[in-house]
Amino acid sequence: MRKFLCFAAALSVALATFAQSGTNSPYSQYGLGQLSEQSGGFNRGMNGLALGFHEHNQVNHLNPASYSEIDSLTFIFDVGMSGQVTNFKEGGKKLNANNADFEYAVAAFRAFRHLGVSFGILPYTNVGYNYSQAVDLNDGNKTVATNTYSGTGGIHLVYLGAGWQPLRGLSIGANVGYLWGGYTRTVVNSYSDSYANSLVKRYTADVRNYKLDLGLQYTAKLSKKDELTVGLSYSLGHEIGGEPLLEIVSQNTQTGVADTTSSANSGNKLQLEIPHSYGVGFMYNNNNKVKVGVDYNLQQWSKVKHPVSVGGDGTALYQMAEGVFNDRHKITLGTEICPGAESRSFIKRIRYRAGVSYTSPYLKIGNQDGPKEFSASVGFGIPIMNAYNSRSILNISGKWVNLKSGQFITENTFMLNIGLTFNERWFAKWKVE
């Protein structure tokens, strides 16, 4: 009961902190927001490597087929948080911003032989930014026009999944999730001349819908100590609702008179969408001491319809359009080294991790490709308890992320991730003689 209460408390904290934004990036003003990494504490040390990974004492929710490998006597509970420092650079100007976030809370256990179950809560997207641009109109009256951009929100995911091993070496799995959340984005055009009307554009959406993820893993024995795992994943793309709305408010600060126009959409409710996603990964395992893997992920954003504003500043025509995004390609290479998981030496029991990845730009900004993403991470899995009924791991990793485009803002982010995995023996039967 005490463990269930701890997990419930962690979920409550997660729900409360998900109301806050996990990003400061101005790029979160596009699409559904900044896409969350969604990986656990141990994945992050390998820069999110996951599709071919399975472990008896870790929750790998990025491939639900991995749940079938969960130990039969334990309940696994994993929570994580992160802190980040981001440097923004554009046109010779620099700015730093800090952020901290409660990232996820997930759990898993063995339900039946070769059948594992997992559930948890984690972010899907984040929206959080606030910046402004001022321009001198050179109209002879020293009038300055200021555009202020701000946004908050994000979409969150709660899921329940299962992984089953029907044949030796072959596992299949599925996560059924529920997406909820939304965003509020505002663009304010104001002027130093108090007689000029200010113009406010407000974009809102409220999402409530399902999400489906499928996974498969097949492990082939290469020798007594070596094995190779192939992992596949698929996420269903579909409409998720949201009823995105654009409102335009024109207001005179002197008179206080305001005119509000809601978006015209021919009487039909607009629908946000998520893309079909595909992934393939390989993991080579040498005697559980050295693991090396590679993942490739494709998200078909180019086929997703998204609402866009058309017309002049005084109109509010908001309609669905295709080709707003590019397909998103991501390739990740990672490794984990553990000299001796059962060794008496503390240093040998530590898991040493590293990973790098490249992500192609999927955003289109003014008909130009958005930023490319390069990232690298290092991490450690540190055993902090090693009793018979408790084998917990502290997962710590540092990650550098570079978002760069020749035309737009460059972001350099250093992120510190901390995850704590509790691995408790719940289902063992004690025999007294």
Feature roles, as predicted:
Residues 9, 70, 127:
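Active-site-proximal flexible loops/turns
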Residues 14-16:
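N-terminal signal peptide c-region/cleavage motif recognized by signal peptidases
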Residues 20-38, 43-44, 114-433:
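Outer-membrane beta-barrel porins/channels
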Residues 9, 57, 268-269:
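Residue-level detector of alpha-helical transmembrane segments in integral membrane proteins
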Residues 18-122:
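N-terminal, post-signal peptide beta-strand-biased segments of exported outer-membrane/organellar beta-barrel
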Residues 2-10:
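Sec-dependent signal peptide recognition
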